[in-house]
Amino acid sequence: GLYVDTKTLGTAFSLATTNPASVDTTNGSALFLDPLTVNMTFSGLSSTNSGTNGIWLDGVSGNLTVTGTTTSNNAGGHGILIENSDGTFNFNDINVDTPGADGIHINNTPSATINFNGTTTIQGTIGDGIDLSSAGGGVTFSTTSISGAGADGINMSNATGTYTFGGTTINGFEATNGGINFAGAAANATFGVTDIGNGGVGTAIDLSSTTGNHNISFATGSSIHDVALG
């Protein structure tokens, strides 16, 4: 994979690509950038059996685009981790399978713009399907499918910022968790047609203790079924 750690050595530089390239890695992260200013375009990213995170962006500024598919299989940590970053990130299709933590985890990105423009498919997580609880900024998902989450399907508890989801399907999450967890959130969120089901257990949407004058909306045609609490 592409591993750049300027923090440990105390160096600072920028990284750019002139032609889109792909990264396909086994037993490591496809990208580990910490911290870095970038102007990069990739045609695809793939990580299998990483001991940490499949894709790991920490303290990244600038622009990073993936025009093709980003894949993380069997990562020891998160499938995709974006943290402490203020860049603009554009992804196309996402496939995350059986990570050891969250499928996608976004943390401390109040000035970032993060777009998942294709179809995001996440399955078999130990943690949340998507964790936005400490993200901030603006995050967009075009089409999302989450199955077999080990905690929340989408965790937005205590979140701030603005979030836009297109069509969203959540099929299976931990019985003591929620399909979408907004507990304590102070965020604006718009969802397209959304379907949430969980084999008769769990809470579909948790709006407890949300704060401030914020808007959370779901498109007409959304459905909740096979849960303990709506």
Feature locations, PLM:
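Beta-strand-rich solenoid/repeat architectures in extracellular/passenger domains
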Residues: 1, 5-28, 37-53, 61-78, ...
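Extracellular glycan-recognition regions
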Residues: 32, 56, 131
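Residue-level marker of regulatory loop/turn positions in helix-turn-helix DNA-binding domains and
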Residues: 34, 83, 133
